[in-house]
Amino acid sequence: MIQMQSYLDVADNSGAKQVMCFKVLGGSKRRYAGIGDIIKVTVKDAIPRGKVKKGEVYDAVVVRTRKGVRRADGSLIRFDGNAAVLLNSKQEPIGTRIFGPVTRELRSEKFMKIVSLAPEVL
């Protein structure tokens, strides 16, 4: 469950290490984002010579949360931290690699690229 001011790790090689959510997209009063939701983030920590710089604003899709996601069979998939993948203006991933596992809930038309790049799909 991600809300405004939440810090997330970045699960791609775009050059950002940590981002902060400042808006949950999808409704004017929407408060929380879960796995598969798009949020607006600002880069708080970046590596030198990366594709993104500190202070820049991007869209991102949430790929892992501490809260987890409940499946139809009743199982719950949780992670040790919150993570996101940065997106460009066309909603495509900026990085060319994805680090760590992602969930099957991302397998929509929009995020098949992220699922195919991920080393493990849970």
Swiss-Prot record:
Keywords: Ribonucleoprotein, Ribosomal protein, RNA-binding, rRNA-binding. One of its GO terms (biological process) is translation. It comes from the Bacteria. GO terms for molecular function: large ribosomal subunit rRNA binding; structural constituent of ribosome. Disulfide bonds: none annotated. Belongs to the universal ribosomal protein uL14 family. Binds to 23S rRNA. Forms part of two intersubunit bridges in the 70S ribosome. NCBIfam families: rplN_bact. This is Large ribosomal subunit protein uL14. It comes from Stenotrophomonas maltophilia (strain K279a). The gene is rplN.
